[in-house]
Design a protein with these regions (language model features):
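Alpha-helical transmembrane segments in multipass membrane proteins, preferentially the mid-helix core
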Residues: 84-91, 110-123
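Core segments of transmembrane alpha-helices
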Residues: 47-61, 81-85, 109
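N-terminal signal-anchor transmembrane alpha helix
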Residues: 2-21
Length: 157
């Protein structure tokens, strides 16, 4: 499958695999870094909302096959996969210990995002600079949130 309009349907599955890696230890890991921690319920709610958005974006692109839907997908995956991967990788390197989610970030999220991005450029004839800007804007909230968690011990919201 080379068509990003079909492969996007894997994104919800990848999110579930990522959450399966995070779930056993993320709340404890997070709460050891951030004074105003999170509960397991908040973790579940945030990931449930993320799953529903991912499902919606995947179905939107698969159903419409429109350039606008591809840009929405690039923005969302920029947040979900690119930004989230940067959070996990940066945390692991900066703190010198495993950040729950880093394995699926490296093995699933980053390769999928980069593949989807590259295929979307070709398939939708997107300008690379435009697609990069869309992905960067999408990733920005997660990058800011990650910075606050890892380097300031606080959360964005």
């Amino acid at each position: 499958m080379r068509d990003p309009c079909q492969v996007i349907l894997l994104a919800p599955v990848l999110l579930l695999l990522h959450v399966a890696e995070e779930a056993p230890g993320f709340v404890t890991w997070f709460n050891n870094l951030v004074a105003d921690g999170i509960t397991l319920q908040l973790f579940a709610w945030a990931n449930g909302a993320g799953y529903l958005i991912t499902l919606f974006v995947a179905m939107l692109l698969a159903g419409s096959r429109e350039t606008a839907a591809a840009l929405i997908a690039i923005a969302w995956l920029g947040f979900l996969m690119l930004g989230n991967s940067m959070l996990h990788i940066t945390a692991t390197l900066a703190l010198g210990r495993y950040a729950p989610g880093v394995i699926t970030s490296l093995l699933l999220y980053l390769p999928f995002f980069l593949w989807f991005f590259a295929r979307s450029l070709d398939h939708f004839r997107l300008r690379c600079t435009t697609a990069m800007a869309v992905a960067a804007v999408g990733a920005l909230p997660m990058l800011i949130h990650g910075y606050f968690i890892v380097f300031e011990g606080r959360r964005l919201v």
